[in-house]
A protein has these predicted regions:
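Short, Lys/Arg-enriched N-terminal segments with co-localized hydrophobic residues
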Residues: 16-25
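Conserved glycine-rich acetyl-CoA-binding loop
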Residues: 114-128, 137, 148-154, 159
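Conserved catalytic-core motifs of GNAT/GCN5-like acyltransferases
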Residues: 143-146, 158-180
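A short beta-loop-alpha structural element at the N-terminal edge
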Residues: 27-41
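Conserved GNAT acetyl-CoA-binding A-motif
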Residues: 134-146
Length: 193
């Protein structure tokens, strides 16, 4: 019994010597006008990555688009320890891409992750946030799309609970960013639970 007590005391003493673990503080909030340059930096990084992977890549988005999204509270950021780790935009209607879908849904666009925070499952965290946001608005689905048949991205979205609904080339692209003219659009949907 004395051995067991000494062993427990030794293990407790060792546990006390562990270095403190710093937990990251994570916050999701609306982007602000002061974030515009950082948003465009992240878009450029994401576009360069898409080019490197020979994927359909984003054009340079008009600054007015981002400013309007910020002013409409539809541009979001995930902060980790005060640094922008991920950005995205939302809308409640996406008829140009999704057609005449009548179910109330949250549409997510242009997810861009700060390379310093890659590999931390941030998309999954933002989808968890989207689920709670959608519930608070009585929405039925979270919907996303991507241009080009990116099998890795399709698999990733399926892994985090999205149903891949298929792909098709859009017939009408007026009013959409240029990359929608360059490939098939892949559609993803997840029920809000």
């Amino acid at each position: 019994m004395k051995y067991a007590t000494n062993l427990i005391q030794t293990r407790c003493a060792q546990a006390k010597k562990l270095k403190p673990i710093k937990l990251q503080e994570m916050i999701i909030e609306n982007s602000e006008l002061t974030d515009v340059s950082k948003i465009f930096d992240l878009y450029r990084i994401a576009t360069d990555y898409m080019k490197l992977k020979n994927q359909v890549y984003w054009p340079e988005f008009p600054k007015e688009l981002i400013i309007n999204e910020i002013e409409d509270n539809r541009q979001w950021k995930l902060l980790i320890d005060g640094k922008i780790a991920c950005i995205w935009a939302t809308t409640m209607n996406d008829e140009l891409i999704w057609g005449n879908k009548s179910e109330p849904s949250l549409y997510i666009h242009r997810i861009a992750t700060n390379p310093e925070f890659r590999g931390q499952n941030l998309v999954e965290k933002l989808i968890n946030w989207a689920n709670e946001f959608g519930k608070s608005k009585n929405l039925k689905y979270i919907r996303m799309d991507t241009v080009g048949l990116n099998k890795g991205l399709i698999g990733h979205y399926e892994k985090i609970g999205f149903e891949f609904l298929g792909a098709k080339r859009l017939e009408k692209t007026d009013g959409l960013p240029e990359h929608y003219k360059n490939g098939e659009v892949c559609y993803f949907q997840k029920s809000i639970i």
